[in-house]
Amino acid sequence: MHFSPALKPGKLLKRYKRFLADVQLEDGTEITLHCPNTGSMRNCLFPGETVWFSTSNNPKRKYAHTWELMATPTGGLIGIHSGNANALVEEALNKGIITELTGYDSLSREVKYGDENSRIDILLESAQKPACYIEVKSCTLLEDGQGYFPDAVSLRGQKHLRELMHMASLGHRAVLLFVVQHTDIHSVAPAAHIDPEYANLLKKAILSGVEVLAYRCEISPDEIHLAQSCPVRV
């Protein structure tokens, strides 16, 4: 995924009201960005460090600028836009980068499924094999060298695990795919210290036949894309 037009830099001042962030531009001007991340963004906020943002020409938007990337004090980069994860996975699937998920004839997005009024992020289908239901999660929380998901209690994430278990019980292929949008994360684990119920459900899901994958992103101010798999430690 190439950032076009090119992203612009600024210095983070603060994030507030969940969906807003103030940044200072190189000329000293302060602007407000839309923050496209519903999580706590735990360990992802570094006031004074560089952020990169995109700009929309849609006159109906209240905030024209969207926060895309965050630099870390150690020189790493974080993909702030959690909504990019699905598009990154679709791009990687089309290029055959996710080797565990090749050989399907069609790809659909946001298809209704399950018993709890859910929509699957990605559905892969083929006449020769069972349908493959893929839930995509963006992982950005880094603590003590380990990547974790979720970064806050996630009832929605718990629901999606139950839905995947149900799909697996029906004979479909069910996959949980972590998209690691943090260049310093090299493995992913359930955040039992944050959401113990999610961690327990993940273990049950694996025993029920749900596959769990994680892929790291290569990130720069020019582009972001899925690059290689990394371990999931349960």
From Swiss-Prot:
This is Sugar fermentation stimulation protein homolog. InterPro entries: SfsA (IPR005224), SfsA_C (IPR040452), SfsA_N (IPR041465). It holds the Pfam family SfsA_N. PANTHER family: SUGAR FERMENTATION STIMULATION PROTEIN A (PTHR30545:SF2). It comes from Shewanella sp. (strain MR-4). Belongs to the SfsA family. GO terms for molecular function: DNA binding.
